C-alpha cells in the first residue's frame, strides 16, 4: 500500500517514480493533516527550523530527477482536505493514480494552490472526471466519513507521515525509502 498526501512534496517525488520501483503498489490518498494531528505534530512546512532545508532538499531532488524546477504553491502548506477527499472520489472511479499525479504536478510543477476548490476541480477535469459530480461529492457527508475512515486505517497500520509504503507489514516512510520497499517486495516474492 502506497499512502500519499497531495500537498506533500515528498509524496509527489515518490509518486513520480513508484511505478518503476513498485509497479503493483496500491495507492491510497489520506488526509495528511489528520495524520499529523493524531501524532501530536504539524507539517514540517510550518516549522521554521526545518522549512528552508527541507524545501531546498525537495527542490534538489526534483532537479536531479529531471522533474524541472519545483514551484511552491502560495501559500504552502495549505489545507489539503478537499484534495484528499477528491483523491478518494477518484479512487472510486479507478482514477486515483492519474488524479493524484495531476493534482501534485499542478501544485509542485505549476505552483497551484490545491487549497482552492477550483484547483481541485481542474485536476479532476484534466483526467476526465466529471467536475460537477466531483463538486457535489466533495460536500457529501459520506465522502467526508470515508476519508476519515481511510485516514484511520492508515494510522492503524502505523502510518505517521506521507509518503509511506507498507510491504508485508513493514512500514517504509519517505521518498528516500522506496528502494528499500522495492527490495523488501523482491525478498518477499523469492521467499514464497
Question: Where in the sequence are the language-model features?
Answer:
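Beta1/beta-strand and adjacent pyrophosphate-binding region of the FAD-binding site
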Residues: 1
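C-terminal cap of thioredoxin/glutaredoxin-like
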Residues: 4-24, 105-192
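Structural alpha/beta surface segment adjacent to cysteine/selenocysteine redox centers
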Residues: 6, 10-110
Amino acid at each position: 500500500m502506497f499512502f500519499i498526501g497531495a500537498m506533500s512534496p515528498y509524496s509527489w517525488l515518490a509518486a513520480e517514480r513508484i511505478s518503476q520501483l513498485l509497479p503493483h503498489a496500491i495507492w491510497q490518498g489520506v488526509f495528511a493533516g489528520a495524520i499529523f494531528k493524531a501524532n501530536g505534530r504539524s507539517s514540517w512546512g510550518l516549522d521554521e527550523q526545518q522549512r528552508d532545508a527541507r524545501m531546498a532538499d525537495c527542490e534538489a531532488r526534483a532537479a536531479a530527477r529531471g522533474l524541472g524546477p519545483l514551484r511552491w504553491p502560495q501559500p504552502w502548506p495549505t489545507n489539503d482536505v478537499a484534495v484528499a477527499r477528491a483523491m478518494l472520489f477518484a479512487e472510486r472511479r479507478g482514477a486515483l493514480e492519474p488524479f493524484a499525479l495531476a493534482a501534485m504536478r499542478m501544485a509542485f510543477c505549476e505552483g497551484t494552490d490545491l487549497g482552492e476548490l477550483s484547483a481541485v476541480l481542474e485536476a479532476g477535469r484534466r483526467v476526465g472526471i466529471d467536475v460537477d459530480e466531483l463538486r457535489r461529492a466533495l460536500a457529501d457527508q459520506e465522502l467526508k466519513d470515508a476519508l476519515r475512515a481511510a485516514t484511520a486505517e492508515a494510522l492503524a497500520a502505523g502510518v505517521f507521515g506521507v509518503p509511506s509504503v507498507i510491504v508485508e507489514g513493514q512500514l517504509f516512510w519517505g521518498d528516500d525509502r522506496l528502494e528499500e520497499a522495492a527490495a523488501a517486495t523482491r525478498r518477499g516474492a523469492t521467499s514464497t
